[in-house]
Amino acid sequence: MSSEPLQDLRNRLPVLAQTAYLNAGTCGPLAWATADALADGTSRAAVVGRGPAYFEVLVSAHARLRAAYAEALGAEPADVALTTSTTDGLGRVLASLRLQPGDEVVTSTDEHPGLLGPLAALRNLSGVTIRAVPLADVADAVGPATRAVACSHVSWVNGERAPEAALREVGRDIPVIYDGAQGAGAIAVDPASLGCAAYTGAGQKWLCGPVGLGMLWVSRDWADTLRPFALSYGNLAEPARGLDAEPWPDARRFDASAISAEMASAGATATELLADIGWDQVFARSAGLADLLEQTLREGGYEVAPRDRTPLLSVVTPDPPAMRARLADAGVVVRDLPGRPYIRVSTGVWNSEQDLQRLLDVLTA
């Protein structure tokens, strides 16, 4: 990415004026246009009201957001549900499996609480067994009692990728559910080629939208198995039929029930800003910056957690919370991982080599 387009992008993201923002793995930087879309939509609703015209805007905004998320994933809009978070999507699809006592779900030992929470609820409510193994071993851990695999596509701890080829084979027989919080908008996904039953993602991380948005891709091959547990007005093809109303045959049957027009518009605006750059360039530059940082750190004698080619990198430090605070004081935003010896760095297409140097200056001081 040449300097002029990069600077133009950075000018649209006000936090970058003073801050080396390296934390899209938590929340990406908000663009002025995203903030304006949220504010303008809310103001318009306040002034004009939320009558029939508002709901026409809402339907249009949902369609726009669905299309934007689908493009980011490399999917068809009809296969993408709109959710409020990665966890929201995970909860919806796990509940749809209708598992029974004695059934087993395989996951990994380094999962985010956003997946562990729904899995724990599933265990406590349904009596299923949750079996956790290292991410690299999840496919090999599948046994006779396994009814699903639910794991990260990209680990939130170190940027490791799941064993995609092996899980593709597993997915021929049982549903594979990916937590794509660190995948959607960070790397090329193409969920259909992954052979998974469902792929969840977040709108506020690598897609730089407001907190409160996410997506759930659902495979058409698993439509008969993944039946939504809770339905609301927007999930029904003909709501006027009351108890006889059927859900939409496409992914809309999994939509969250209350995503406002202004939120959807803001999320679409954020995602389209990245799409205008070109997703191939977004993915290549984001991972390339992490690769450059890893090389520099290793040459300087620092220990970097094993990772794959993703925009996430975790470096070992003696006191991660203290280092995170030192970096914050210097205008460098990263995060530490509770209970782990790392600070985690997330590099996005919007970052510059100077952002990395500011990080290195504090680490080596």
Report the location of each language-model feature:
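Pyridoxal 5′-phosphate
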Residues: 1-365
